[in-house]
Amino acid sequence: MKVLWAALVVTLLAGCQADVEPEPEVQLGNEWAKWQAGQPWEQALGRFWNYLRWVQTLSDQVQEELLSTQATQELTALMEETMKEVKTYKAQLEQQLGPTAQETQARVSKELQAAQARLGADMEDVRNRLVQYRSELQAMMGQSTEELRGRLNSHLRKLRKRLLRDAEDLQKRLAVYQAGIREGAERSVNTLRERLRPLVEQAATVRSLISKPLQERAEAWGQRLRGRLEKVGTQAGDRLDEVREQVQEVRAKVEEQANQMRLQAEAFHARLKSWFEPLVQDMQQKWAELVEKVQLAVGTSPTSESSEKQ
């Protein structure tokens, strides 16, 4: 495959055979240059186109490849790759189309299928021409093949022009299809926006209507709560004053009772003193008399003893 692509590059640089009209080939080559940087299916079609240009050179290497089945296999692989990329791109566009009108989607899909079928038929025709040329070339081995080359070259040139025309038609239809998708998406977005706008405005109105009573209720509830807190504070202050007064009353009563108890104790002490004081005085007097008697007795006793001894 690398050898084929190297030969392709050399062929593109060298140009076509002398029996091919140069000016139309240059124009077609310029037309196909833009396909190299497009969508994946366009790039695949460009590779098919370049392979066809290489086959059209009818060089000795190409004749050897055509006598084998490799050229047909390569061409078949490029055809399948191109049609696969076309189907993939078409499926992506259909997926992007979304909820577009079914009638429009069916019509556009039908047009794309027709253009896709024409492109596939053109590539199939190219492959059949190459198979026919290989059969005729094998039958004419050793004979002059100039007439066969000229006929194949003419057919391939016409097929390339038709292939370019059908490819451009498919490209235009896909572009229209994609533009329709964008317009449909924009219309859907605008329609959705128009439908949602009244709902958004209504929601804003309802929110404002709901928020006002809620705010009023919150303010009323806050006022009631403040009133209750103030009432509780006032009641607590009054209760504290009552408790303070009760404490003062209890303190006064306790002090009064303490004074009464002190007075009673003093009175009782006075009564006890009045009771026992005469007794104490009498006992003290008797005790003094007893002491005096003892002293007198003790004082007279030594005097009598001393007189007896003398």
From Swiss-Prot:
- Which UniProt keywords are listed? Chylomicron, Endosome, Extracellular matrix, Glycoprotein, HDL, Heparin-binding, Lipid transport, Lipid-binding, Oxidation, Phosphoprotein, Repeat, Secreted, Signal, Transport, VLDL
UniProt-annotated stretches for the region Specificity for association with VLDL: 271-283
List cellular component terms (GO): chylomicron; extracellular exosome; high-density lipoprotein particle; low-density lipoprotein particle; multivesicular body, internal vesicle; very-low-density lipoprotein particle
Residues annotated as region Homooligomerization? 259-310
Fill in the PTM field for this protein.
APOE exists as multiple glycosylated and sialylated glycoforms within cells and in plasma. The extent of glycosylation and sialylation are tissue and context specific. Glycated in plasma VLDL.
The leader peptide range reads 1-18
Instruction: Tell me the ranges holding the sequence repeats.
Output: 77-98, 99-120, 121-142, 143-164, 165-186, 187-204, 205-226, 227-248
- Source superkingdom: Eukaryota
Q: Does the keyword Calcium apply?
A: no
Region described as Lipid-binding and lipoprotein association: spans on this chain: 203-283
Question: Where is region (8 X 22 AA approximate tandem repeats) located?
Answer: 77-248
Asked whether the keyword Cell membrane is assigned, the reply is: no
Which biological process terms from the Gene Ontology are attached to this UniProt entry? acylglycerol homeostasis; cholesterol efflux; cholesterol metabolic process; lipoprotein metabolic process; melanosome organization; phospholipid efflux
Chain spans, region LDL and other lipoprotein receptors binding: 155-165
| InterPro entries on file | ApoA_E, Apolipoprotein_A1/A4/E
Q: Of which family is this protein a member?
A: Belongs to the apolipoprotein A1/A4/E family.
List the protein's name: Apolipoprotein E
